[in-house]
Amino acid sequence: MKQLFLIIGAPGSGKTTDAELIAKNNSETIAHFSTGDLLRAESAKKTERGLLIEKFTSQGELVPLEIVVETILSAIKSSGKGIILIDGYPRSVEQMQALDKELNAQNEVILKSVIEVEVSENTAKERVLGRSRGADDNEKVFHNRMRVFLDPLGEIQNFYKNKKVYKAIDGERSIEEIVGEMQEYILSFGN
């Protein structure tokens, strides 16, 4: 059975970098998928779905639920690794519920933990506006992305706390410290 770890955090929290490094350090057993990267890759293909994704992401809005869930489940099931890290999901209560429903309806994947990389809004803003990855990284869009992240956060945290799978990690430290703590935590579940 595959072990799933969801890594959430504000734009600029470092969640993608953290997950990439953990997967790289444990390449035999851990696969990492960034929801953002999966959606950007689809968008770059300029397919009908890709253009639809681009329409939403260029405005800092959420991509429709069915496209996101389909993309994530496809990535999990096609992976040959036993531990799967997915960052940037869930970003809404609806995404959380849709994934929970799908996970409950099968026995190939078990959700082990939801890890939130916590950073202040100022840190997130400095990191995002400093990296300028694309057209979606300007200040107005940052504030929209921050709102989209914060609006459902309390409900998402409570849902996973009630399931006893929520863990918060301080994202204001060095990458080495964050990755070290997160990796140790993930590996503590065994195989």
Swiss-Prot record:
ATP binds at G12, S13, G14, K15, T16, T17, R131, R173. Residues 130-136 are annotated as: LID. One of its GO terms (biological process) is nucleoside monophosphate metabolic process. It comes from the Bacteria. GO terms for molecular function: adenylate kinase activity; ATP binding; nucleoside diphosphate kinase activity. Signal peptide: none annotated. Pathway: Purine metabolism; AMP biosynthesis via salvage pathway; AMP from ADP: step 1/1. CDD domains: ADK. It is an enzyme of class 2 (transferase). Its EC number is 2.7.4.3. AMP binds at T35, R40, E61, L62, V63, G88, Y89, P90, R91, Q95, R133, R145. Residues 34-63 are annotated as: NMP. PROSITE patterns: ADENYLATE_KINASE. Belongs to the adenylate kinase family. Catalyzes the reversible transfer of the terminal phosphate group between ATP and AMP. Plays an important role in cellular energy homeostasis and in adenine nucleotide metabolism. Consists of three domains, a large central CORE domain and two small peripheral domains, NMPbind and LID, which undergo movements during catalysis. The LID domain closes over the site of phosphoryl transfer upon ATP binding. Assembling and dissambling the active center during each catalytic cycle provides an effective means to prevent ATP hydrolysis. This is Adenylate kinase. The lineage of its organism: Bacteria, Pseudomonadati, Campylobacterota, Epsilonproteobacteria, Campylobacterales.
